[in-house]
Each structure stands twice: as C-alpha cells, then as structure tokens.
Amino acid sequence: MSHKPAHLLLVDDDPGLLKLLGLRLTSEGYSVVTAESGAEGLRVLNREKVDLVISDLRMDEMDGMQLFAEIQKVQPGMPVIILTAHGSIPDAVAATQQGVFSFLTKPVDKDALYQAIDDALEQSAPATDERWREAIVTRSPLMLRLLEQARLVAQSDVSVLINGQSGTGKEIFAQAIHNASPRNSKPFIAINCGALPEQLLESELFGHARGAFTGAVSNREGLFQAAEGGTLFLDEIGDMPAPLQVKLLRVLQERKVRPLGSNRDIDINVRIISATHRDLPKAMARGEFREDLYYRLNVVSLKIPALAERTEDIPLLANHLLRQAAERHKPFVRAFSTDAMKRLMTASWPGNVRQLVNVIEQCVALTSSPVISDALVEQALEGENTALPTFVEARNQFELNYLRKLLQITKGNVTHAARMAGRNRTEFYKLLSRHELDANDFKE
C-alpha cells in the first residue's frame, strides 16, 4: 500500500507498545515522533509540525480524550485517532461525536489502521489544493517557510532566481512555482544553459530560420515560443555564454524574441524562472555575468538549503524514495534497518537529494531482503564517492585542467596561451578568472 508522506505523533504510556507501533508505521514510510504521556505529547506539538496524532485512550494523569480536548485548544482541526483495549460502541460513538477522527480497538488490524490514517490525512488536508508542491517531500521548518514564499510569489509574474547547490532540487522547486501559478495549465519547459554549446543553446532558446546555419533545413521555433503562456526555466543560468546574456536581456526587456537568421520579432508571453549553483555577485565582479541581466532575473531570490541543513527530512525522504524505487523494481523491499537509517542521517550528502536518490536506487537494486541493511547503505555511499560527475562538473574540471596545462606550457604567457586555445586575450582572462587562476603563478 502506498501512503501519503506524513509526520505522525504517537502517544502511549506503554513504552513497549509505543516502540512497536512506531517501528510498524516507520516501515510503512511515515515519519514518527513518540511521547509517553499526554503532557509530553503536547510539548511535541508545540515544537514540531505534526500531521496526525494517534493516542492510547487509557493513560495516567491525562487520558486520550483529555489529550484530544487539549489538542483542539492549541491546534483546532488536528486529526486524532484513539486506540484502546477497552473499547465499546458507546465509547466510539461518544468519541466521534466530540470530533475524534477514528476510534480503534486493540489489537489493531494494521490495514484498518493504515486506512484510518490515510483517510484522516485526506480529510484534514487544507482547503487550498496542495498538489502544486506534492513532489517536494519535507517537514523541515526551513523548507516549509521557503514553500510558503514560493506559493506567494507564484501568484505574480515576477522573475525568480533560485540558488542552491547541485542536487538540491532547483528544477522541482521551479516546477512547483509554476504549478501554483495562474499559468499552470500552460507549458513548463526547462533547459540547462551550461550543457549546450553556444550556437545550439541560442537556437534552442530563440529558434532559427531555414538556412540560418549548416543543417538548418527548416524553420524551428525556440523554447520561448514553445513555452508561450507558461514558464521557461533556465537552469544553470550562471553558465550562459556572455553573447547570449545580451540577447536574453533584450528578450526580457522587450518581451520579443528573434529567431536565428530571421529579421522578424515575435511577441512572447512567458514567465522566467532561473537557477544557479554559482555565486552570481562574484561572477559579476569578475565580469562573467551581466549586472543588468542579474537584476532582471533576480526580482525575487529563493535559496534552497543543502540536505545537510535539513537532516530532519532525511527519514521522510529516504522512506518516500525507497517506496518509489521498490514499486518500480522490488515490491518486497519494505524498510531500512535502524542502523541503516542512522547512517543515512549522519552522511554528509555533498550531492544532496540527487545523491540520496542514487544511494537508495543502488540499495534496492542490490538487496535480496525486505529490509535495507546498514552494510548495503555503507557500500552504496562508498560507491557514490567514485560516481561520475555531472556534465557541467566534468566540463568545468576539464577547463580547469586544460588552462593549467596551457599556462604550464607557456610559462604564464597569456598571449601565447590564448593563441594556443584559439581565444582572444579578453576571453582567456575571463576563463582564468572563472577558475580563479593567476598566470603569474606559472611564470618562472
């Protein structure tokens, strides 16, 4: 059974039963926090965002119904499921009349419990449609605040610049903004500005006329036209070549696009969301990124935190991703061992969510057990340390190595090195600046 990701609070004064129920629900993909008394449960609610409370009925000091009453004072509408070994039909009727979502008798049938949880979460969902952000699995206060900002900015047409390390999910965030916007019925189109050569990127963005270049055998509309009425997502905008930055600025200023090889401007109605892992103010200081373009793109700035900055999301994400991978490949895989989850929680995650996805895919591919072991997670993490870099990362590393070799050969002579590279001195100095190389360091 597939369940909606949710954060559950379990309250029971029996530590053994509390642990058992917590393990069962965690194995189903829920994020769980526990409390051994009603008072402790209220303290948890004060410090954490919880989607649903499951409480035992009979507890010392504060029973389940008293806890329910206190919860409704501080969080009206919070769904509560009551479990009891001493239930009766009158008790159940009385509880539901007071607003308890469900009243289940112990020992609880697991399918009945899962169904009650799913029904409670479905019926207690906010009136506003949250499907716009369903691909973003989080309970991190940092991310939830960011999502609220995204929801607000989605209602206008201002340009948004998303900052964040590689693998943090910038494109998914851009898609969420589009989904929450009035443009959501129109196309969302993404392009990586650092993954294509300059002429090909120009043709992709702006289109081309027949005969514009060798191989242009017919007219072709660009992505600005393809995204008409919708959103164009410019990923890795910091890697866009300087000549195209000028053309992009003109498009943003005039709201018109001119295909390559054409003398005709075409009106466009497109919202721009861009993203980068680079420090664009530093790139501007080095002359690599246009200041006027930066301010056009950066009307609203959103910074996505690294996975290491929101470790509370790791169990939720890991279980969600495990469920997806298992459904595709091995449905018998159900959960992580306790030690495996601890290892996931303490890993450094330089590749962020993208790396977590890869690790879990590897674990599912290699396991023959319903439970992912700590040893398997360790093996997958070690494999990630030698994994292939992204295309942009590989290209940047090649450029760095190539420039170092040129400067070594020419003993720091920039004119000679630029000539060997087929670049003019200005372009070559920009390359050196981008990679923070000083030709003087190579002079003898």
Curated annotation (Swiss-Prot):
Instruction: Output the InterPro entries linked to this UniProt entry.
Output: AAA+_ATPase (IPR003593), CheY-like_superfamily (IPR011006), Homeodomain-like_sf (IPR009057), P-loop_NTPase (IPR027417), Sig_transdc_resp-reg_receiver (IPR001789), Sigma_54_int (IPR002078), Sigma_54_int_dom_ATP-bd_1 (IPR025662), Sigma_54_int_dom_ATP-bd_2 (IPR025943)
Q: What happens when the gene is disrupted?
A: Mutants show decreased amounts of glmY.
The record's annotation in Pfam families points to: Response_reg, Sigma54_activat
Protein location:
Cytoplasm
**CDD domains in the record, alphabetically?**
AAA
- The answer to whether UniProt assigns keyword Protein transport to this entry is no
Q: Which residues form the Response regulatory domain?
A: 7-121
Q: Where does ATP bind?
A: 164-171, 227-236
GO annotation, biological process:
DNA-templated transcription; phosphorelay signal transduction system; positive regulation of DNA-templated transcription
Residue span(s) of domain Sigma-54 factor interaction:
136-366
Q: Name one GO cellular component term.
A: protein-DNA complex
Provide this UniProt record's keywords sorted from A to Z: ATP-binding, Cytoplasm, DNA-binding, Nucleotide-binding, Phosphoprotein, Transcription, Transcription regulation, Two-component regulatory system
Maturation and modification? Phosphorylated by GlrK.
Primary location class: cytoplasm
Name the Gene Ontology molecular function terms of this record.
ATP binding; ATP hydrolysis activity; cis-regulatory region sequence-specific DNA binding; DNA-binding transcription activator activity; DNA-binding transcription factor activity; phosphorelay response regulator activity
Ranges of the DNA-binding region feature: 414-433
- Tell me yes or no: is Cell membrane among this UniProt entry's keywords: no
Q: Which PROSITE patterns does the entry link to?
A: RESPONSE_REGULATORY, SIGMA54_INTERACT_1, SIGMA54_INTERACT_2, SIGMA54_INTERACT_3, SIGMA54_INTERACT_4
Briefly, what is this protein's role? Member of the two-component regulatory system GlrR/GlrK that up-regulates transcription of the glmY sRNA when cells enter the stationary growth phase. Regulates glmY transcription by binding to three conserved sites in the purL-glmY intergenic region.
- Spell out the note in the miscellaneous section: Not required for the regulation of the glmY-glmZ-glmS regulatory cascade by glucosamine-6-phosphate depletion.
Q: What is this protein called?
A: Transcriptional regulatory protein GlrR
- Specify the species: Escherichia coli (strain K12)
